[in-house]
A protein has these predicted regions:
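N-terminal segments that mediate ammonia production and transfer
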Residues: 2-195
Length: 195
């Protein structure tokens, strides 16, 4: 998995915050911003309950690293990977309901991609950022995730590709909000579930 992204609200663009993050055999990317209504990023919230040693294990210093560390905590509690992601989003949404939690996480056996946007419409702050880069017309696509089934020469299912915004993608299916795709890295089979 790989991910090109802008820095989250009011966070520096530094190497430690580049994706993917990797810890405990998992790779993680996050296409979102975990901030309150005033644009204050979760990293400035010293009272948010996160295991500091787990956070440090991600190698990052951003909201995405906090999100990943919350997922890792749920895995440590014994949750399956897909449910750990769902639980982490539920927990984070209690404090940051309008944030975007779109992400992908990959283990040796699975790829999970989640579309979980806190807003139906792209926020004005995101539109401004896109405008700064001359891409304002693409801002509406900011939180959209898509998947496409791959077929082999015989027409049999051979896997799935998941992608997010930024270019025209004919022939792809939209991953609905609060929906995840769970893909086997072993045989390419997949299923959808809601969180």
């Amino acid at each position: 998995i790989w991910h090109l992204r802008l820095a989250s609200s009011n966070l520096p663009l530094i190497m430690e915050n580049q994706h993917p993050f990797y810890a405990n055999g998992l790779s993680f990317i996050h296409n979102g911003d975990i901030s309150d209504a005033n644009g204050r990023n979760i990293v400035t919230n010293r009272s948010y309950p996160v295991n500091h040693s787990v956070f440090l294990s991600t190698g990052g210093r951003s909201d995405s690293a906090i999100f990943f560390s919350v997922i890792l905590e749920y895995i440590a509690f014994g949750f399956a990977l897909d449910e750990a992601v769902a639980q982490a989003v539920r927990q984070l949404r209690q404090a940051y309901p309008k944030s975007s939690y779109n992400c992908m996480i990959q283990s040796e056996d699975q790829l999970i991609a989640l579309c979980a946007a806190g807003r139906e419409k792209t926020s004005p702050r995101i539109v401004e950022i896109y405008d700064e880069y001359g891409r304002g017309e693409q801002a509406a696509d900011y939180r959209v995730m898509r998947y496409r089934e791959l077929r082999d020469d015989n027409g049999d299912s051979a896997g799935v590709v998941v992608s997010s915004s930024g270019y025209k993608q004919e022939g792809w299916n939209v991953l609905e909000n609060d929906q995840m795709i769970i893909v086997s890295n072993r045989n390419g089979t997949y299923r959808l579930r809601s969180i």
